[in-house]
């Protein structure tokens, strides 16, 4: 299994269990998230409550919770939305911090295509949700989420060059 860690914070943000598509010449990865139900385990122990005088489901009060699989798996923390000015300030700082960690062809590809990726994100800014890794590190990568038109499940966007592949 491969896990993708944030190069700046070390937080685990994604794994190969979630297939991705490259956007903007590979600068962004697009990953489909899914709403899943967590909790509310229905255990059939083979007893017949009506024969035993039991009432309607006197078992444990088990609460079902709907969560997004990627958010839950990697313990992503939702952040307040950015306005355009805040987003541009974040992107400038992020690019500066990330380029210090990149070398060679990876650095060249990032520098060449990050502007178009930034414009792509800016075009969706009003529809984006913002998530950071579990450590909530100020300079870490932000994971962006949005809902495609008519979609019930969110789509996540990652800066590919900000992820480090780690084998587990």
UniProtKB/Swiss-Prot annotation:
It comes from the Eukaryota. One of its GO terms (molecular function) is calcium ion binding. InterPro entries: Mss4-like_sf (IPR011057), Mss4/transl-control_tumour (IPR011323), TCTP (IPR034737), Translation_control_tumour_CS (IPR018103), Translational_control_tumour_p (IPR018105). Residues 1-168 form the TCTP domain. Coiled coil: none annotated. Its main location: cytoplasm. It holds the Pfam family TCTP. It is found in: Cytoplasm. GO terms for cellular component: cytoplasm. Keywords: Calcium, Cytoplasm. Belongs to the TCTP family. This is Translationally-controlled tumor protein homolog. It comes from Hordeum vulgare (Barley).
């Amino acid at each position: 299994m491969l896990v993708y860690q944030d190069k700046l914070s070390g937080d685990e943000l994604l794994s190969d269990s979630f297939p991705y598509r490259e956007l903007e010449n590979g600068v962004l990865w697009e990953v489909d998230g899914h709403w899943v139900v967590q909790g509310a385990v229905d255990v059939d122990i083979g007893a017949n409550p009506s024969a035993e005088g039991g009432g309607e489901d006197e078992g444990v009060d088990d609460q079902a919770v709907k969560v997004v699989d990627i958010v839950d798996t990697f313990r992503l923390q939702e952040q307040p939305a950015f306005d355009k000015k805040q987003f541009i300030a974040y992107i400038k700082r992020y690019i500066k911090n990330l380029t210090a960690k990149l070398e060679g062809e990876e650095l060249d590809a990032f520098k060449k295509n990050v502007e178009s990726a930034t414009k792509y994100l800016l075009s969706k800014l009003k529809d984006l949700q913002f998530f950071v890794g579990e450590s909530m590190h100020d300079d870490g990568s932000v994971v962006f989420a949005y809902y495609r038109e008519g979609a019930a499940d969110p789509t996540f966007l990652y800066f590919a060059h900000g992820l480090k592949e780690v084998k587990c």
